């Protein structure tokens, strides 16, 4: 489990390899990741957008930006949590992801919260990125 806390909002990530969607003979490796966002602050927040910086085992970088997560822009009151699962394909057996969410509070202020860096490593292989 990987975790980061920004402004009392905790982001936890649990990555896992999706063997049934991967095909190493075709250089296709697919990971899922489960994210939990826990609003431990004393203010309402809404997740507006996401940013990912994805680096594969060969050092190739892909940046992904978009509104919300999995088609949702969740609203979290103090004490609320939100969980979702998504995925990431790579052409190498290892990689690393890191990023942030842009949030908005009731006053209309926007700010970024960190998504912790986490490894994507094929089970049983040597790590090459991290």
From Swiss-Prot:
Any single GO BP term: error-free translesion synthesis
Protein name: Protein ApaG
InterPro entries: ApaG_domain (IPR007474), ApaG_sf (IPR036767), Uncharacterised_ApaG (IPR023065)
PANTHER family reported in the protein's UniProt record: F-BOX ONLY PROTEIN 3, POLYMERASE DELTA-INTERACTING PROTEIN 2
Record-annotated disulphide pairs: none
The ApaG domain, residue ranges: 3-127
Alphabetized PROSITE patterns for the sequence: APAG
Domain of life: Bacteria
HAMAP family: ApaG (MF_00791)
């Amino acid at each position: 489990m990987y975790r980061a806390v920004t402004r009392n909002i905790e982001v936890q990530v649990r990555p896992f390899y999706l063997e049934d969607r991967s095909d190493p003979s075709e250089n296709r490796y697919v990971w899922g990741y489960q994210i939990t966002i826990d609003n431990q602050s004393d203010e309402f927040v809404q997740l507006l957008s996401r940013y990912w910086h994805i680096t594969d085992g060969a050092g190739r970088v892909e940046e992904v930006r978009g509104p919300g997560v999995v088609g949702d822009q969740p609203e979290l009151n103090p004490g609320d949590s939100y969980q979702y699962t998504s995925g990431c394909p790579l052409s190498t057996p290892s990689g690393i992801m890191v990023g942030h969410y842009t949030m908005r509070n009731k006053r209309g202020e926007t700010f970024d919260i960190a998504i912790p860096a986490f490894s994507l490593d094929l089970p049983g292989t040597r790590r090459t990125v991290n």
